[in-house]
Regions:
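C-terminal catalytic histidine-bearing segment of alpha/beta-hydrolase fold enzymes
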Residues: 160, 176-218
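Conserved alpha/beta-hydrolase "nucleophile elbow" surrounding the catalytic nucleophile
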Residues: 27-29, 113-115, 164
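Active-site signature of alpha/beta-hydrolase-fold catalytic machinery across serine-
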Residues: 38, 124-128
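A conserved short beta-strand
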Residues: 131-143
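Gly/Ala-rich beta-loop-alpha elbow adjacent to hydrolase catalytic centers
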Residues: 114-118, 122
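Serine-hydrolase catalytic machinery in alpha/beta-hydrolase-like enzymes
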Residues: 2-105, 109
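Short beta-strand/loop motif that positions the catalytic acidic residue
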Residues: 161-163, 167
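Short alpha-helix in the alpha/beta-hydrolase fold that links the catalytic acid
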Residues: 37-40, 171-181
Length: 218
């Protein structure tokens, strides 16, 4: 197995067969791959020929040194945030290419899942990637920089955006803003707003995410 650019929590195919799909799950700010791997554990038997990889983001988190960040979110300057996100995007792209090469699978067999800052990363990375990823499931996220993304979109994978209506970390208003923006860019977008749900992945959200993956990648 290739030595990846990121440390990752990983799960081989539930069927023990040669993998036919790859699901990469990107955690939120201050979390790690182990955190989001709970989704992989819940989904594995329903995607039996998929391998799951849950990488740790490249930087130690500024506000939670026991966790990781894709980029520093304590700064409030949009240009600085974009600049830092582009550094992380380059690294995530390297990781995706390493994994695809390792398993000798086409990018059409790759799906990305993200939570919070991880969602921000997968949207920006996937839409700018020349080869089109199969689909994205993005929980509780937003678009990092609409102007930058609108000028650099080259891929249009199917995307499922989900958010809790009681989210105080990333406002649920970003769900509709992101949908409106992405539809304007000719992407197929599915959305779900959960009632009485805070900044987390609900049980229903997990089930709907799995259903979306099964529909698109199997």
């Amino acid at each position: 197995m290739t030595k990846y650019i990121f440390d990752a929590t990983s799960f081989s195919s539930f069927s023990k067969n040669e993998p036919k799909q790859i699901i990469i799950l990107c955690h939120g700010y201050g979390g790690d791959g182990q955190d989001i791997s709970a989704l992989a554990l819940n989904w594995r038997r329903f995607l039996p020929d998929a391998v799951f990889l849950c990488p740790n983001a490249p930087e130690v988190c500024t506000v939670n040194p026991s966790g990781y960040q894709w980029f520093d979110m304590t700064v409030e300057n949009d240009e600085t945030i974009l600049e830092k996100s582009l550094v992380a995007e380059k690294k995530l792209n390297t990781f995706l290419d390493q994994v695809l090469d390792d398993f000798q699978l086409d990018i059409t067999n790759l799906a990305l899942v993200g939570f919070s800052q991880g969602s921000m990363m997968i949207i920006q990375t996937a839409l700018k990637k020349k080869e089109q990823i199969n689909c994205l499931v993005a929980y509780s996220g937003k678009i990092i920089n609409k102007k930058h993304l609108s000028e650099n979109i080259v891929s249009r994978p199917k995307i499922f955006l989900m958010h809790g209506d009681k989210d105080t970390i990333i406002s649920p208003s970003h769900l509709l803003e992101s949908k409106e923006f992405l539809v304007q860019q000719s992407l197929k977008i599915k959305t779900k707003l959960f009632k009485n749900c805070e900044h987390k992945i609900s049980v229903e959200g997990s089930s709907l995410g799995l259903e979306f993956l099964r529909k698109n990648i199997l």
